[in-house]
Amino acid sequence: MEVHNVELVMSAVAPSQYPTTGFPEIGLAGRSNVGKSSLINVLINRNSYARTSSQPGKTQTLNFYKVEDQLYFVDVPGYGYAKVSKKEREKWGQMIETYLTSRETLRGVVILVDARHAPTKDDVAMYEWMRYYEMPLLVVATKSDKIPRGKWNKQESLIKKTLNFQAEDDFIAFSAKTKEGKDAVWQWIEAHTVGGN
C-alpha cells in the first residue's frame, strides 16, 4: 500500500473512546521495546511518526493510527515490563483484554517478538491467548538484521518451537534497519483488511 496520509486519531483506555468509523483494525502487540513503533514507522514511510522510546512501558494507551482513511493500526501497550507497578500492569491487562476480545472491527493481530532471543513467557501467553480467541495471527520477528544469515533457520525454529507455532498462522522476519519484511507484512495486513475479510 502506498501511504500518504496517516493520523493518530485517538489514544484510548476504554471502549467508549474507540473510533466509530467502522474501518478495519489491526492490533500490534508485543513486549516493551520489541520494536512496535519502528514497525509502524517503516510501514507508513515515516522516520518518527509513532514515538519510539528508550523507556520501556511508555505506551499506556491504545493508540489508533488511521491509515489512508481505510484502516487503523492499533498500538497496544507493551507487556511484560517489570518496573511498572503490578496494579498498573493489571489495569493495562484489563484494557488490552477488553479491546482484543470484544472489538468487532479488529481483523487480526500482529505479535512482535525479538528475533535475537527465544520468546518470553509473556510472548507465549499472548500467542496462546489470541489462538484461543481464533484471531488471525501474524508473528513478526523484529531486528532480524542482527541474526547472521547462516543462523537464521535455527533461530526461526527456536522461536516457532517456543511459541508452539501453528501452521495456519503466519511468520515474517522483519528489520526496521534494512526494511526486510516490510512488503510481506503489508500484504498480510491488506489481505485481512481492505483486500479481505
UniProtKB/Swiss-Prot annotation:
Stored InterPro entries: G_ENGB_dom (IPR030393), GTP-bd (IPR006073), GTP-bd_ribosome_bio_YsxC (IPR019987), P-loop_NTPase (IPR027417), Small_GTP-bd (IPR005225)
Q: Tell me where in this chain the EngB-type G domain is found.
A: 22-195
Cofactors demanded by this protein: Mg(2+)
Q: Which UniProt keywords apply?
A: Cell cycle, Cell division, GTP-binding, Magnesium, Metal-binding, Nucleotide-binding, Septation
Q: Name one GO cellular component term.
A: cytosol
Annotated positions binding GTP: 30-37, 57-61, 75-78, 142-145, 174-176
Please give the biological process terms from Gene Ontology that the record holds.
Answer: division septum assembly
The record ties this protein, via Gene3D superfamilies, to: P-loop containing nucleotide triphosphate hydrolases
Q: Which Pfam families match?
A: MMR_HSR1
Q: Which residues bind Mg(2+)?
A: S37, T59
Concerning SUPFAM superfamilies, the annotation shows: P-loop containing nucleoside triphosphate hydrolases
A single MF term (Gene Ontology): metal ion binding
What does this protein do, in the record's words?
Answer: Necessary for normal cell division and for the maintenance of normal septation.
Q: Which family does it belong to?
A: Belongs to the TRAFAC class TrmE-Era-EngA-EngB-Septin-like GTPase superfamily. EngB GTPase family.
Mind telling me which HAMAP family this protein's record contains? GTPase_EngB (MF_00321)
Q: What is this protein called?
A: Probable GTP-binding protein EngB
